[in-house]
Amino acid sequence: DNTSQIAEKKGAEVVTENRKGYGYACLKGLEHLAQNNPDIVVFLDGDYSDYAEDLDQIVSPIILKEVVFCIGARDKKLREKGSLTYQQIIGNKLACFLMKWLYQGKFSDLGPFRAIKWQSLQELKMEDKTYGWTIEMQLKVLRKKMSYKEIQVRYRKRLGVSKVSGTIKG
C-alpha cells in the first residue's frame, strides 16, 4: 500500500502507527493533532472508497454551528455496487438498530467519513484500538447527547485489499 508515499508527495504530513488496528491509527493521529489544537477533525479512509471532494458537505454543518458531529452515511443509491460486503451491510443495520433502540439514535450507517469538533472529540475520551472505533464514537456522541447530523455521501470500491475480514473476529 503506497498511501503514505502518495500523501507525502501531495503535501500531507504523514504520521505512522506501527501497531495494527484502525483505532490505534486514529489515536496516534489525535496525539499528533493535540500539539496544534485544531477546530475540527475529519476522518476518512485513505483507500479511495470515500470521496474526499465531499469534505465540504461533512464539515459545513459544524462550521455553521448546527452540530458538533457530522457523519457521512453511505447511501445505497449513492454507493458503488459491491463497495460494501454483505457482512458490512448487515452489521451496520444491526448496530444502527441497537443504537436507536438503546439511545434513540438516528444513525443509518457507521461510515468512516466523519467530522467532529476537536473539543467534543476530547470529551469522548476515545479508547478503542481496533475496528470498534467508529461505533464507539457514535455511541459516546449519543450518551453525551451531543448534537449530530448524518449526510448522505457517495462511496466506491476500495483500492487494494481490506485489512478487516468482515467476520466477528475481525
What are these language model-derived features?
Residues 38-39, 66-67, 146:
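Short, high-confidence coil segments that cap the C-terminus of an alpha-helix
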Residues 16-20, 24-32, 52-131, 157-168:
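Acceptor/aglycone-binding surface of glycosyltransferases and processive sugar-polymer synthases
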Residues 37-49:
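Short beta-strand-to-loop acidic/aromatic patch adjacent to the donor-nucleotide binding site
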Residues 105, 126-129, 139-156:
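Catalytic donor-sugar/metal-binding loop of nucleotide-sugar-dependent glycosyltransferases
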Residues 1-10:
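Acidic helix N-cap motif at the loop->helix transition within catalytic regions
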Residues 43, 70-73, 151-153:
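Short glycine/serine/threonine-enriched helix-capping/active-site loop
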Residues 29, 47, 117, 141, ...:
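Residue-level signature of catalytic and energy-coupling elements of molecular machines
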Residues 7, 62, 141-143:
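Hydrophobic residues within well-ordered alpha-helices
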